[in-house]
């Protein structure tokens, strides 16, 4: 697979941006994941995490999760929190967790809701799950609470992007650890461009206080939730200059929403698709693009969490 790398100067000329390098990943339109059944659960052990409450946003009593440590790891290792998409835990977390553990990084994939159980209250309803998970991770004697990362898909991608904001971090609670690096996958940038400037939205103005931390976004150029083929440009342009400098958007050319899905291709209707206008969404797995994204994410977390 070839990568077409654009210099900062080229990106600025074409898109009015001066703050990052964009990689377009040329992908083939492959319709099914690689042979063999996908592993649905992340490697490790099942754990039940005590819940927490975020006033005005919601509460959770307990959070089911899968926690895995690297084999033969040193006494303390970094860890990545994995947040699933609207369809629940579906194998994508396991796909990345295995590779992260092999690279020396522990993983914690939490279950925020079951398939079909997307909260009507929106993203704020699952922020308590993430806060509880981060608290639990820092309490583990084998995890270095100063070296935490967060990644997520779609619903979880939006969460992982928002958690890079100090405004959101303050709502999570002063005792909740601040992760050091974030890797959102297709976080539906077009919708967040509107939500973040809406005073009625619980995440209003979160973009104005994005932290200066490394952030790697993956999104397909044919994502049916988005408007246009470079949907995250406008969102990242809203962030403070220092945060923009630490952000990389990796566009997967020809990639759909969920291009790294570990289940067969599907179509469905979603009211939030097409930049909030609603309509049909295609999810077409591309194993080649998924493998490259996994390599990029593992390299990203290895660089910034230093296992």
Give the location of each predicted region.
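N-terminal cap/lid segment of alpha/beta-hydrolase-fold proteins
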Residues: 39-73
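Primarily recognizes the serine-hydrolase "nucleophile elbow" in alpha/beta-hydrolase
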Residues: 131-210
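Bacterial N-terminal signal peptides
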Residues: 21-31
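Short alpha-helix in the alpha/beta-hydrolase fold that links the catalytic acid
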Residues: 227-238
